[in-house]
A protein has these predicted regions:
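Conserved C-terminal active-site "lid" loop/helix of NAD(P)H-dependent oxidoreductases
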Residues: 25, 56, 60, 79-107
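Mid/C-terminal beta-alpha module of Rossmann-like enzyme folds, strongest
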Residues: 31-85
Length: 124
């Protein structure tokens, strides 16, 4: 968000169809508790509520909230526009939470990333 403000555009790499998982912090808090109470030692859990949000949708949501445009950028431009996230910007990372939900009975119940960001509290 800060880099989008600074650069005047919310950027994404390529066509923006690559996906990132996300989760509401309140849902993650519940997941941590359930993991401590129920998960077998060494379990691999995926705490994601949104199993894959297109990077272009992420950029559009940020742009709408800031009143700026979006821009597709190259991988070479990514560090300027995305900072440390540039390393991950081109990855397509849809992530299933099926195992986590089944093993722990966990169910994300809070707003997803887009809805949460649209509330505006990340932009104060």
């Amino acid at each position: 968000i800060d880099l989008a403000r600074k650069n005047g555009v919310a950027a994404y790499t390529g066509d923006g169809t690559n996906r990132w998982p996300a989760a509401n912090t309140y849902d993650i808090g519940v997941l941590y508790r359930l993991a401590l109470e129920k998960a077998p030692a060494g379990s691999t859990l995926h705490g994601v509520g949104d199993t894959g949000i297109a990077r272009k949708v992420i950029a559009e949501t940020i742009a709408d909230m800031l009143g700026i445009g979006t821009q597709s950028i190259t991988d070479d431009q990514a560090p300027q526009y995305l900072g440390f996230l540039a390393t991950y910007a081109g990855l397509d990372n849809p992530t299933s939470n099926d195992k986590t939900r089944t093993l722990l009975g966990w169910q994300p119940t809070h707003p997803g990333w887009v809805e949460d960001v649209q509330k505006g509290h990340y932009f104060a």
